[in-house]
């Protein structure tokens, strides 16, 4: 099962908006995840955000690049950035996203030029 966590053991139920960029050569890319009002930011949550963990049957992809966005002093969103430095990392990430998308009924749309 493909899942996203910000604190180990606590699955995030909010589905993110994901934006992908890839170099022309295909050997690097970035994925930006935007979670609006994620569960981890609920008032009752006492868990620390230690990174973003993308887990599936192949293993785990980890990024520590997680930032909170605040509106009127209250956390409203999380933005996580995952940088891929090789074609292999890109392929692994895409396999995770295919599983995650299938399990959460998500689709892929290309940006307008």
Swiss-Prot record:
NCBIfam families: PS_II_psb28
Gene field: psb28
Protein name (database record): Photosystem II reaction center Psb28 protein
Pfam family, one: Psb28
Listed GO CC annotations: photosystem II oxygen evolving complex; plasma membrane-derived thylakoid membrane
Family: Belongs to the Psb28 family.
InterPro entries reported in the protein's UniProt record: Psb28_c1_sf, PSII_Psb28_class-1
Location within or outside the cell: Cellular thylakoid membrane
Biological process (GO), any one: photosynthesis
Membrane topology type: Peripheral membrane protein
Subunit structure: Part of the photosystem II complex.
Sorted UniProt keywords: Membrane, Photosynthesis, Photosystem II, Thylakoid
Lipid metabolism listed as a keyword: no
Principal location class: membrane
């Amino acid at each position: 099962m493909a899942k996203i966590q910000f604190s180990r053991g606590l699955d995030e139920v909010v589905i993110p908006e994901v934006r992908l960029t890839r170099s022309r050569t295909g050997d690097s890319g970035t994925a930006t995840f935007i979670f609006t009002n994620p569960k981890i930011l609920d008032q009752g949550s006492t868990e620390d955000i230690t990174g973003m963990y993308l887990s599936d049957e192949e293993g785990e992809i980890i990024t520590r690049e997680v930032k909170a966005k605040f509106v009127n002093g209250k956390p409203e969103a999380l933005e996580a950035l995952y940088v891929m430095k090789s074609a292999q990392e890109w392929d692994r990430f895409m396999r995770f996203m295919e599983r995650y998308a299938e399990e959460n009924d998500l689709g892929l749309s290309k940006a307008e030029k």
